[in-house]
């Protein structure tokens, strides 16, 4: 057993008390990202090592692996704790998103170690989609690079508001305060182009030597701020969904017997309470919450992130993919939306194509009407393109086969985030973040002349690959 865990169990007074304390600690999900060889995996290995989260057999295995694959001479190569794939160890790079868990007395953490290479942008976007904070690692010798800008942009695009800029390898620049300040100013100048209200913090460190990671550095007396671990332990995460209106996407209708009908799902925003009047969308039918059921017993209320089963006072028609909101709130159904897309397939995204999409438990179909632009994620410029290639990020217009109740992604990632699914292979080919739900911009049929209506039907019959919309309101 890990000696630190054994000590904590003894301190808490037994296994049950320890597990109870662990369960009620706050959880922080964060990712590490940066350019190739900036030391992301080494930093995570250092965090695990210095917080004593490594078991004895892991430490023994690490000694052996360091001799075979290590890059640090006689020292332990802490990066090997995270780089688990054989290809990663042989190449000395991170390819897949590697997840690790550790905890301190103050908090629990889930780390996503994401790839630094541009060709693995989709992997990084996947890792960032569930995180609250991003650690942007920089090599003190190189400063702000294109990949640093790219990772900053992707992180903020996916809703991350807290950025910790970790200036690594300070030991290679003689722990120079001047170098650190120059990099700090360069990044703040660039960060002015990023969207939203960002919380940006800076920590100079050496992941290899352990300076300012979990222990205050004796080599940088000029830095009086917190260590990286202290930042992670004490930072207050602003979760927008806690302050948002109620959003409860129904994932499953639970009917084990004739006497029970519940709607299972995870609260995606706001708070639901017993007795609260709710409205089911898209039907608009109202009822009130009779019970909030969980495995551990009934609750009086449930907040964002809690998985519960709601029992309503009335038996109304609700199915998987429907959305429960507060009865006093309105959420308009829209047929189209402007969506930021991260494309993940070898086959590029082309206007006119249709895909299955999944959003908050609901599955439907969408057509790509237009690609406004692709973002050059190395310098944040926009360029007009005919298609969106693998790892491309751009703004597109989508038209849905049926009206959907959507939020902006920055307001609610669950009801504003979607995935694209290839209709033939059933493979996920892209991720989308709703920037702006759009009301139906099409004219009523009566606004078109008889000639326009006839021409529209002719085009749809003989040129279906053009993807022309039915002006009479069909699909």
Curated annotation (Swiss-Prot):
CDD domains xrefs: CysN_ATPS, CysN_NodQ_II, CysN_NoDQ_III
Region (G1): 34-41
Residues noted as binding GTP in the record, renumbered to the chain: 34-41, 113-117, 168-171
Enzyme class: transferase
Keywords: ATP-binding, GTP-binding, Nucleotide-binding, Nucleotidyltransferase, Transferase
Region G4, residue ranges: 168-171
Keyword Membrane annotated: no
Residue intervals of the tr-type G domain: 25-241
Pathway(s) annotated for this protein in UniProt: Sulfur metabolism; hydrogen sulfide biosynthesis; sulfite from sulfate: step 1/3
G3: annotated span: 113-116
One Gene Ontology term from the biological process aspect of the record: sulfate assimilation
Enzyme Commission no: 2.7.7.4
Pfam families noted in UniProt: GTP-eEF1A_C, GTP_EFTU
PROSITE patterns: G_TR_1, G_TR_2
InterPro entries, per database record: CysN_GTP-bd, CysN_II, CysN_NoDQ_III, G_TR_CS, GTP-eEF1A_C, P-loop_NTPase, Small_GTP-bd, SO4_adenylTrfase_lsu
Family assignment from sequence similarity: Belongs to the TRAFAC class translation factor GTPase superfamily. Classic translation factor GTPase family. CysN/NodQ subfamily.
Reported function: With CysD forms the ATP sulfurylase (ATPS) that catalyzes the adenylation of sulfate producing adenosine 5'-phosphosulfate (APS) and diphosphate, the first enzymatic step in sulfur assimilation pathway. APS synthesis involves the formation of a high-energy phosphoric-sulfuric acid anhydride bond driven by GTP hydrolysis by CysN coupled to ATP hydrolysis by CysD.
Protein name: Sulfate adenylyltransferase subunit 1
Protein species of origin: Cronobacter sakazakii (strain ATCC BAA-894)
Phylogenetic lineage: Bacteria, Pseudomonadati, Pseudomonadota, Gammaproteobacteria, Enterobacterales
Gene designation per UniProt: cysN
